UniProtKB/Swiss-Prot annotation:
Keyword Hydrolase recorded: no
Classification via Pfam families: tRNA_Me_trans, tRNA_Me_trans_C, tRNA_Me_trans_M
Protein name (Swiss-Prot/TrEMBL): tRNA-specific 2-thiouridylase MnmA
Species of origin: Rhodococcus erythropolis (strain PR4 / NBRC 100887)
Entry annotation: catalytic residues: 101 (nucleophile), 193 (cysteine persulfide intermediate)
Length: 370
């Protein structure tokens, strides 16, 4: 089988490529150039797409004895990931750019080019397991990345390979060292690759500008402070609110609601954050077909954490793919519009199975009667 190995310059993708070679596949390595602007992406050990990372990927390919190329996807990345990220925050949402990159860049733009060039699959260094079209959590629970892959369709999964999902991270590093890969001890990348400073608020402010609004007490309606734009806030945020002192009950204040139409950011105590029901749109089902009737499942709303028992049901909401109505058996906090909600079928033996996902469009704070 002809396999295109996406090589970020890190240890995970290098070992994924090595395993594809060891499995007897005809492997070609490729690094995605996602920006041409100096300093636009993180560099060194904290990045995944910098010139230094491209060099590390090339050296790993040389060790493996496979052809290697750098492909320019900068324009597509800006349009589908960066611009989408900015627009979502301007609308008071909280997007995850890693999901969008997987959905639009790695497993659409890259995969489409791979197929056009005669490749059968794209291999990446994601920590997840995929067998017969079924996507499951990785063996290494701490490194599991099935959440950021939950946006992939059945067709996209049919062209994907995740060679390292059955192995703990430390063993991957040991294997890299045994294979003579210089990236064996390279630190993991963190944060958002296209925000070099790590200051998301400043990054967004430079692109959205000042859109004044008010910070309002969620219970009393009292205006507590002014702000420069809703893009500086996310649900559950505690720091940087521009408000002195605790909430009326003496406890810390959190962002509990964002209203982009009026520029209002509501803050209150933690009790205002509980969510018992979630509405999601643009549903994606990994099997290619929506389930019939209610489904008992676990839902996850963040890459790390935000997990709860639930009952989910596909609904016709007029959006592409339809919607998902989710009733929680226990409350979640910090649930924001724009986040992805990923549904899992628990399986302690084989690993939790990803059923599908949707983009959160609304929440309800009243307990349900399941």
């Amino acid at each position: 089988m002809r396999v295109l190995a996406a090589m970020s310059g890190g240890v995970d993708s290098a070992v994924a490529a090595a395993r594809a070679v060891a499995a007897g596949h005809d492997v070609v390595g490729v690094h995605l150039a996602l920006s041409t602007a100096p300093g636009a992406l993180r560099t060194g050990s904290r990045g995944c797409c910098s010139k230094e990372d491209a060099g590390d990927a090339r050296r790993a390919a040389d060790v493996l004895g496979i052809p290697f190329y750098v492909w320019d996807f900068a324009d597509r990345f800006k349009e589908d990931v960066i611009d989408d990220f900015v627009a979502s925050y301007a609308a008071g949402e909280t997007p995850n750019p890693c999901l969008r990159c997987n959905e639009k860049i790695k497993f659409t733009a890259l995969a489409d080019r791979a197929v056009a060039l005669g490749f059968d699959a794209v291999a990446t260094g994601h920590y997840a397991r995929l067998e017969d079209g079924v996507l499951r959590r990785a063996v290494d629970a701490d490194k599991d990345q099935s959440y950021v892959l939950g946006v992939l369709t059945a067709d996209q999964l049919s062209r994907a390979m995740f060679p390292i999902g059955d192995t703990p991270k430390e063993q991957i590093r040991e294997e890299a060292a045994e294979r003579g890969l210089a990236v064996a001890n390279k630190p993991d990348s963190h944060d958002i690759c296209f925000i070099p400073t790590g200051d998301t608020r400043a990054f967004l402010g430079a692109r959205i500008g000042v859109r004044p609004g008010s910070v309002v007490d969620a219970d009393s309606g009292e205006v507590l402070a002014a702000h420069d734009g809703v893009h500086g806030f996310t649900i559950g945020q505690r720091k940087g609110l521009g408000v002195e002192g605790p909430a009326g009950d003496g406890r810390p204040r959190y962002v509990t609601a964002i209203e982009p139409e009026t520029g209002t950011v509501r803050v209150g105590s933690a009790k205002n954050l509980d969510v018992w029901a979630i509405s999601a749109q643009r549903a994606i089902w990994t099997s290619g077909q929506a389930p019939e009737g209610p489904v008992e499942c676990m839902v996850q709303v963040r890459a790390h954490g935000g997990l709860a028992q639930a009952v989910a049901e596909a609904v016709d909401d007029g959006t592409s793919g339809g919607g998902i109505s989710i009733s929680l058996r226990e409350p979640l906090t910090g649930v924001a519009k724009g986040q992805a909600v990923v549904l899992y079928r628990p399986d302690s033996e084989l690993g939790d199975q990803v059923l599908g996902s949707g983009t959160i469009s609304g929440t309800e704070s009243e307990p349900n009667t399941l």
